[in-house]
Amino acid sequence: MIRSTLSSWREYLTPITHKSTFLTTGQITPEEFVQAGDYLCHMFPTWKWNEESSDISYRDFLPKNKQFLIIRKVPCDKRAEQCVEVEGPDVIMKGFAEDGDEDDVLEYIGSETEHVQSTPAGGTKDSSIDDIDELIQDMEIKEEDENDDTEEFNAKGGLAKDMAQERYYDLYIAYSTSYRVPKMYIVGFNSNGSPLSPEQMFEDISADYRTKTATIEKLPFYKNSVLSVSIHPCKHANVMKILLDKVRVVRQRRRKELQEEQELDGVGDWEDLQDDIDDSLRVDQYLIVFLKFITSVTPSIQHDYTMEGW
């Protein structure tokens, strides 16, 4: 809790900046956080902004109805140690630090654990994601016909075991003033709706991150004491900066290939018309990417659940 207290003081004392440095640092301003939150809620309506309430400790640099984002009752049907990673985070980050195939630019955020709903509809688990539109599609829920499987499962007496494993999480995304990036908080419940202890919530954090990234702390935006596990945001900006650079390289290469094709077809003015194109990831797409690399920290929480409500 000492670390949590120090973090709270740092958040309180760090001055707010409104100068955008997204493309150069991977950090965002409060205004850009709101912009990215609006986009997330538009694309995935189960994500909501907070409602105004007397229970909230407001920060005056954000609108009262846009202090934090929340999605409730996200399923978690197994523990993190039961998830087999396709690619370990160390391997993925090493790949980012080296000059490799630009086609794998978003493989970091697209890498998934073997999970009942982790594979996008119509996709394969090992397919690389190379565009933000495909990334958005990857977050959608795959429609499955579960009737036959459920009957067989019940016949084998597996339902009781499944209920013991079943958990749900409320996920919160707030703005970190000290790191100028989004910060994730998770609050867990068992199948009966009783709150999970911090130790139980840590079971759903990847072992690689439990002692490095996850912290027990109270939700800072509620006046009432609500215990959570937060995902420390110290590396978020660096990951986003690397990703931005990679996206830029991929899109520039594709544009060059398209230009060459157009020139072969006799379209000589194509290059002049494309000079003002922005090859970077848009700042409003920030949280889409943010949620994808959060899955490496909490692999058993079904983040793909965002396209369905309760």
Swiss-Prot record:
Task: Please provide, alphabetically and separated by semicolons, the GO molecular function terms listed in this UniProt record.
Answer: Atg8-family conjugating enzyme activity; Atg8-family ligase activity
Per the record, its GO cellular-component terms are: cytoplasm; cytosol; mitochondrion; phagophore; phagophore assembly site
Q: Where is this motif: ATG8 interaction motif (AIM)?
A: 270-273
Name a Pfam family for this protein: Autophagy_act_C
How's its activity regulated? ATG12-ATG5 induces reorientation of the ATG3 structure, increasing conjugation activity of ATG3.
**Residues at which a 1,2-diacylglycero-3-phosphoethanolamine binds:** 1-7
Concerning PTM, the database record says:
Acetylated by NuA4 complex acetyltransferase ESA1 at Lys-19 and Lys-48. Acetylation regulates autophagy by controlling ATG8 interaction and lipidation. Deacetylated by histone deacetylase RPD3.
The miscellaneous annotation reads: Present with 3610 molecules/cell in log phase SD medium.
Q: What is known of its domains?
A: The N-terminal region (residues 1-7) is involved in phosphatidylethanolamine-binding and is required for ATG8-PE conjugation. The flexible region (FR) is required for ATG7-binding.
Family note? Belongs to the ATG3 family.
Q: What does this protein do?
A: E2 conjugating enzyme required for the cytoplasm to vacuole transport (Cvt) and autophagy. Required for selective autophagic degradation of the nucleus (nucleophagy) as well as for mitophagy which contributes to regulate mitochondrial quantity and quality by eliminating the mitochondria to a basal level to fulfill cellular energy requirements and preventing excess ROS production. Responsible for the E2-like covalent binding of phosphatidylethanolamine to the C-terminal Gly of ATG8.
Protein name stated in the entry: Autophagy-related protein 3
Give the species.
Saccharomyces cerevisiae (strain ATCC 204508 / S288c) (Baker's yeast)
